[in-house]
């Protein structure tokens, strides 16, 4: 079985999870519809102002609602930043390999922008493969966000890199940035090498 064949569809996994949780996402509404709703409710108006800010965001129809700009592996002991640019050539990322020293603690940081409408239930999903077999699946709930000019930043909880002779080697990751409506905001692939030392 090839690595491609071994990779399940994200939608199938999410459907299974949603049915177990009996979760039904709310219907999607545009930013304008949300702003028009409950105008007479002072507390809701205040909440929406807090979420959306004072300045209306210009909705450029050519820009996607959610733009994922970069992913970083945050580790205090790393000799330099470990960052991948997600606005350029995603195919090139498949040829690069990022390095983590075995056993170190690190966090995944994702930078993204919401450009037009409020997006509900953003999540980051990562499938990890080794020699074509899936060895891990992680799902991180990112949350709901309104549009604004500045980027948002999401940090996962602290994780520990695998360690030991058997854990060292190269892992292939398939990452998804999606939401409650199963909108695929970005899917990309990248490689991570677990080594005995940073400079090995």
From Swiss-Prot:
Preferentially expressed in hematopoietic cells. It is found in: Cytoplasm, Cytosol. Its main location: cytoplasm. The modification Phosphotyrosine is found at residue 23. Residues 30-39 have a biased composition (Basic and acidic residues). InterPro entries: Ig_E-set, Rho_GDI, RhoGDI_dom_sf. The modification Phosphoserine is found at residue 144. Keywords: Acetylation, Cytoplasm, GTPase activation, Phosphoprotein. GO terms for cellular component: cytosol. Residues 1-39 are annotated as: Disordered. The keyword RNA-binding does not apply. It comes from the Eukaryota. GO terms for biological process: negative regulation of trophoblast cell migration; regulation of Rho protein signal transduction; Rho protein signal transduction. The modification N-acetylthreonine is found at residue 2. Interacts with RHOA. Interacts with RAC1. Interacts with RAC2. Interacts with CDC42. PANTHER family: RHO GDP-DISSOCIATION INHIBITOR, RHO GDP-DISSOCIATION INHIBITOR 2. Regulates the GDP/GTP exchange reaction of the Rho proteins by inhibiting the dissociation of GDP from them, and the subsequent binding of GTP to them. Regulates reorganization of the actin cytoskeleton mediated by Rho family members. Belongs to the Rho GDI family. This is Rho GDP-dissociation inhibitor 2.
